[in-house]
Structure formats: structure tokens, C-alpha cells
Amino acid sequence: MATFKVLVLMILWITSIFNVRCEKFVTIPVNCSGEVDIDKMDVMCPNRYNLLSTNHLMEGEEVETFCRPSLRENDLLDGYLCRKQKWEVTCTETWYFVTDVKYQIIEVIPTENECMEERERKLKGEYIPPYYPPTNCVWNAIDTQERTFITLIEHPVIEDPVTMTLMDSKFTKPCNPKHNEVTICDTYNPLIKWISKETSGLNLHCQIKSWECIPVKLHHSHRNMMEALYLESPDFGIVDASKICNLTFCGYNGILLDNGEWWSIYRSGFTHGFLDNHILKNRRIEECKEKKPGYKLAKLDTTYIDLEFEIELEHEKCLGTLEKLQNGEYVTPLDLSYLSPSNPGKHYAYRLEYINTTEHKCVQLGFTYEGGDCRKMLDERDDHGAYYNWTTIKLQRVIRAVCYYHTFSMNLDESKHKYYDQDNRSIQIDEKFISEVLKSTPLIDRHEKYEGNLSWNGIIIESKNGHEKNVIVPSASQYNHVMINKILKRLDTVMYDSYKFDSESGSISYNKIVPIVREDNLQNAHRVDVIQYIKDKGSYIINGFTGWFSSLGKLMRWTIWGVGLFFSIFTLYKIIMILRKHSNDNVRKEFKETAGKVMIGQPIDTKSMSRTSIKANNKGKFDKVKDLFTPRSKTISHLTTDTLKEHTDGTYEELHFFNV
């Protein structure tokens, strides 16, 4: 669909270009006065100047400054997300010296004054990043330390140059900026506010100090202020004020040209305010309806340079006409048209009057010089003199007048030349206009004979049968080149589409930012700190363990641990020794009872018994003796004897019972 629209627009523009090519613009004097006869040496070429130039001002013209936004800047307005937070540290220490430290950030709704004060501190370089206060742990108590901070996070938003509203995915609706004040906007999250960085309320795109400015020449078609107003500039050519409309862009009043370009008037105070008078008093310029501002693409425009070249070429042709005129050569209507200015205004106009004269020349042959008059035939001689004559055109008068030139258009498709005044449609070239304005003399040519008169600056007035008249204007106007390029400039203009805010999704065209906080998850808006999130996932045990190695009771706890460890080891050692001694006494007692039974001859069935005892030997050392008693032999046998280096407390015995 978009491609189809582009093709339709291109076809319309090309059709307009063809229409312009079928139309020719010429300059014709409409009011002449002060006719005088002058010498041919006094004929001068007109002062030609570029129609789009603002360096040459004629009577009734003024220059104003027009500006437009630069395409290098964006539509972002700098600002901050303002949040009020309490950074809190809670230390809980039990009576048994277990410490638990809890870190958390609590979100609080900030006030506008708090955000504005923090903004001032940040702009002055006094901004302090938030931090947790130092921990203060007290035995068998809960201590809470907190610091309140206003945090500012840089976050630019979009400012629509057409509606001058602020848009962002975090806003519930477009926000209106305040000029020369700090702008504060609400967001979906009631705990967060947006505050502007600057007080101008304008983004870089809409700051007129960075705009591109050009001089524009303004003039009326007539002295009457109610008549048509024209704007001329090297950048956008010639624009009729009746084809523009008022449109506000970036908060500034401006005009929208017929090719779609938007310009703002940046007046310096030295002008008469032609455009303001035209807008306010005449009410000729209406408000734009359903039109979008546009800007021209960065492209080199050669219209101004082409006109400069044409001016130099026209001036060279005019100098050639003066040379022929001063040399006494015949000046054709085309040569005379180069004396006509190529732009409207007050200039001289020239009309030449020629007459037919008869010239003769003597043809002298032999002996004819003796005769006093070569025109007399000397028939009595063989050789005679003679002469010949001919009819020629001779310049009789050069008439000059002061005229006001208007620009006329002519449709080339019509068989008869019809001219229409571009400034005043009421002016028509009819018989009255020809007789009163286009004063003429009979057109005389030395080769062709036809009815016609020659008027100002080579304008030819043809008449057939003395009734039907046709006006031929050989001069040209700079509008021929300007109007064609004016249509072509529409192809270089791009419309500026404004931003669209979707209230349901919070999204903005050209800015696909997904909202961070929505209405459906506002209940979790305070869960913003990482420490609280980690603690909820299992850091309680870690904090309890690390609490032992922190707080003011650290030294006391290590001392108690050391004393407790010493007493625990000593107690365990004593218990082991007591249990070992008690075990040895039981074994010795049981062995004695068994040995007594063996000595008195009591049978022990099929069980054999072994005994290990410690006995002193003759060398003053102790031997470890293992005795084996068997029921068959009824005897005790010494199996092994080991010599011990030392003896501990009491007799060491081991009893082993097994079946035989």
C-alpha cells in the first residue's frame, strides 16, 4: 500500500513538471512614464541580479531570518528516574553470641521537592552514591542502622516535536513539559518519578540556537499591503504566501511551504513585519489542517548557481546589442529583447524607430571623373559614368521610458499567445492594454514585408487584416528556471511523522522499549535490592555462621571456646583411663577364679583357657608369660615369654577361651 502511494505521488509530481514546461514566463512593462528621446550611446543594459539573492533589495523589499531544526539532533530530552530508598542494616545478636546481619533496601514514595533538591545537588557535583551504614552489633539486642537516599538514574525520554509532549514506556500517558521550569512526570510505578535535567523543556532537536537559519526576502506584488506577498530564498526558491499555512513545530510558530518544508521566523527586530501583517491583518494565511511538517533531505541545490550563470549570459548578449547599436547596424527584435530585465521591478524600457531611406553610390568608369556629377549620363563618350541606389533601414529615434515590469505566464499549448499576470490577474493584454501601454511603431524589415509594430524591448504586435492581434514577447524571465526546480524540490521533501503512544501497552512507535514495571506486578515493586533477594534464597544460614566471626564479642567467644576445649579434652582423657583400669581389674578377677578351679581338680569340660601374666624375673625386668591350660592333660603349659622394658601399674593379664 505504501509503495502504491509513493508511485501515485511521483506520477502527480511528474505531471506537474510537464505542466510547468508547457508554460513560459516573460517580463512585460505594465506602467511606463517619462518617455524621452536619447542618443544611441546612452542606451544601457539593465542591472541584473539573482532573483533568489538577498544581497540586493529593491523598493518595498525586506529580509527576515527563517530557521528550521537541524537533522543531526534527536528528539530525546535528558532526565532522571527519581527514587527514594532506605538502606537499612539490622544486627541481631543472641545471648549465646550468635549474630545475624540483615541488609535490605526499602522503597519509599519520593516527594517532588526531594527530587528537585537532589537534582540540584547532582548538577553541582555534590551527588553521593547510596551506601549501607556501618554495622553496630550489641550483645543480646537488635540494632538497626539506616540511611535515606534520593537516587537519580539517567533516563532520557522522547519529546514529540509536533505535540510537544513527553512519551516513554514507563509513563501512563503523555506528559506535558514545563518551559523554564523543572518537569516532573509520574510513571507506572508510584515509587518512581521522572524529572527533567534542564529547565528549558526542549530537546536538542527543538533548541533554536542549534537550528539552521537562512535569510529570506519578502516583497509584495504592489505597494498595496493587501496584495500578494512573495518569499524568495536561495534555499526554497520563490513561494507565494497564499499557498502557505501556519503550523507549530517544536513549540515555535512557523509556516509550512507548499512543498512541505517547515520554517520558523526568527525576527531580529529591524523589519516591518510583512509576514505578520499578512497573517494578522489580512488573515490570508490559515492554519494547517491535516498536514505534517517536512524537511528537505541533505542535497546540493544548484538553482542559485544556475541563475548566476544565466545572468552572466544575458548580460553578455546585452553588450552585443549595444555594440551593434553603436556601430549603426540593424538591431533585430530579438537583440532588443536583451535590454529587458529578467526579473520584475522598476527598470528602463527602450523603443527604437526605424525608417526606410534610399542610399546611392557612384560607379566611376574611365573619364567620368571629369564630369562634376556622376549621376549624369555622358552618352557622347564611349566610356560613361553611372550610379546605383537602394532602399535601407535607418535608425531615426531612440525612446526611453521608466516602466514597472511584471511577470507574465504564457501557455505554449494555445495557438494564440495569451499572457497572464502572475501578480495581478486583473491585468490582461487586450487592445486597450496594447494601445495604452505597449506603444509601438510600425515594424520595418528590409527583407520581409508583413503587418506589425515594434514595442518596448522588442515586443512584436502582429495584426492580421487590421483586427486580430497577437503579441510576441521574445524576452525571458528567471522564473522559467525557478518554477521547474520548485516542483522538483517536492521530491526531496520528507514528511515528519509524529510519535504515537499506546496507552494499553505503554509502547511508542520508533521506541520499542518494554515497560519495566506494569500494573500487574506493582505488588513486587519494592523487591529491588539484590541482597534481600539472595537472603530470601538461603543466605540466612550463611549469615548465622559468619555471625560467629564478627561483632564486638568475638574475643570473648574465642576465649570461652578455648577453655571449654581444654576441659573437654581433659575430661575425656580421665574417662578413658578410668574405663581402662576398670577393665583390667575385671579380667584379673576372672582369671583368678578360673585358675583356682583348675588347681583343685575341677573339670572344665572341653574348654581350654589361656592366661597372660606379667612376672618379675631375676634380671629386675618383667616378663610377659602366656599359659595354656588343657582339660586332657590337666596341666598348664608356658607358651611364650616376652621381656618387657618396663611395667605399668599392676599385673597385665589376658584370658582367652576357646573350644578344644
From Swiss-Prot:
Listed Gene3D superfamilies: 2.30.29.130, 6.10.140.740
Membrane topology: Single-pass type I membrane protein
Record's function text: Attaches the virus to host cellular receptor, inducing endocytosis of the virion. In the endosome, the acidic pH induces conformational changes in the glycoprotein trimer, which trigger fusion between virus and cell membrane.
Gene Ontology biological-process entries: symbiont entry into host cell; virion attachment to host cell
Family listed: Belongs to the ephemerovirus glycoprotein family.
Virion surface side: 23-558
Subunit field text: Homotrimer. Interacts with matrix protein.
Keyword match Repeat: no
Signal sequence bounds: 1-22
SUPFAM superfamilies the UniProt entry points to: Viral glycoprotein ectodomain-like
Spans within the Intravirion topological domain: 580-660
Post-translational modification note: Glycosylated by host. Glycosylation is crucial for glycoprotein export at the cell surface.
Subcellular location, record wording: Virion membrane
Keywords noted in UniProt: Glycoprotein, Host-virus interaction, Membrane, Signal, Transmembrane, Transmembrane helix, Viral attachment to host cell, Viral envelope protein, Virion, Virus entry into host cell
Gene designation: G
GO cellular component: membrane; viral envelope; virion membrane
Major location (coarse): virion
Source species: Adelaide River virus
Coiled-coil intervals, chain numbering: none
Membrane listed as a keyword: yes
Protein name per UniProt: Glycoprotein
Pfam families attached to this UniProt entry: Rhabdo_glycop_CD, Rhabdo_glycop_FD
TM helices/strands, residue ranges: 559-579
